[in-house]
Amino acid sequence: DYDTGSRIVLPYLRYLGIRSLDMLLLSHGHHDHAGGAAAVAKNIPIRRLILPQEQPSADIQALLKNTKAQLIYAESGTNYSLGNTAIQIISAPVGSADSDANESSLIVRVVSADGSIVFTGDATETEELLTAGQIQPGQVLKVSHHGSNASSSMPFLAAVSPQLAVISVGAGNSYGHPGSETLQRLAACGAQVRRTDQDGALKITFDGSQVKCYSYRYQKEFF
């Protein structure tokens, strides 16, 4: 089983000289979002851990066994500060024992003096529509649910109004993500789209009002 924590996240943090984390926030407990978090927690200290209000998945249970971080369950409308950066919890649905973890996905807006990013996990269209009237624009949007047609509704995209939309998705996946309808909606709202299945790992920086995106893929063929 490929562990993104030990194979990707930890080496990159060490490359950057990061030896501890002030905060780790997980959108929800599915393996493709929380997998690898336990390996990170086992190797570097974490001060605060923010989790969705859902039944803990196996990945989150493993994480909790490997950290002494202050445990915080996210609540809608709560803000946290990291220096000059604000972490805004826009939506934090409370999941039930029999609900899909996607329905508990956090929608989070990260804002600094340089720019803003909206993270959506696997948020559903229903959750997006409930937050469309509350969320402020974000220059960058992490597109929900790998670009599924069942997310990224036009009211939500209009509210966020992203310059750049990032789709984290595996090449040749069996779900057909990203969906053609989602790509059409992103084009209609004027967002530049970058995809990990085409571009590999992406690094995003802010330069004044401009958003810059760098690809770390060196081969033309799919991974």
Locate the predicted segments by residue.
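Non-globular, low-confidence helical/coil segments that flank catalytic cores
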Residues: 1-223
